[in-house]
Each structure stands twice: as structure tokens, then as C-alpha cells.
Amino acid sequence: MRKKLNVYEMRIKVYLLENIPFQELQNALANFVDSALCQCEELISFHEENCYKFYSIGTLWPVERGMTYRKEQIYTLTVRTVDPDLARYFSEILRNHYTRKIKGLTVENRIIPRKMISE
């Protein structure tokens, strides 16, 4: 019997504390999520370990045409994982987490519906 694999999605509303050029965006988002991971002693070793993490970070939405995400604006960041414990942790910690450039406001959770692949 195969175990059902759920994909958990967190849509995080974030407020930018600084302008972020497109070239620096992924680094700023990774720093936001990684610094949240490092708030928990158990997850520090997980973060530092060289292995698959089983989560992914999207980019900010809506997309900015001017190649700079603007200070004092609210955007949506999408994080997905297959680990229910990690999803729970992200849901709790990212809602009020902040770095020098990004502040988390709210988190909306959902499980991505499974769809059969067709030809």
C-alpha cells in the first residue's frame, strides 16, 4: 500500500521594508525563509545539512514590471513542501517573521489537490 503524498502550500503576505531589485530577490526570499528555519534549534542542523529539503520557494506576486519590488508594498510569497511538520512550522513562524528587507504578515494554508496526468 502506497502512502498518500500531500503537497502543502503556504501563501505568505509579505511587506517590503526596502526596495529589492529583481537580481537580489531570490537571495532576499531565501534569507527570509532560512532565517525562520534557524529560529528552531532542531531545524538549524536540517538547514545546514547538504541534502534535499523537500520545500520550494516561489517568487513574489504580483510581478513588478520595473524590475524592482517596491518598499512599503504588500506581495504574496508561495512556499510549498511535502513535509507536514515543516508546513506547520512555516505556517506558525513566517506570519510574524521579519528580516531587514521583508516582514511576514499573514499565512494562508492549503493542500494542493491531486490531479491525474493525462496524455
What is the meaning of each model-derived region?
Residues 1-119:
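RNA-interacting cores
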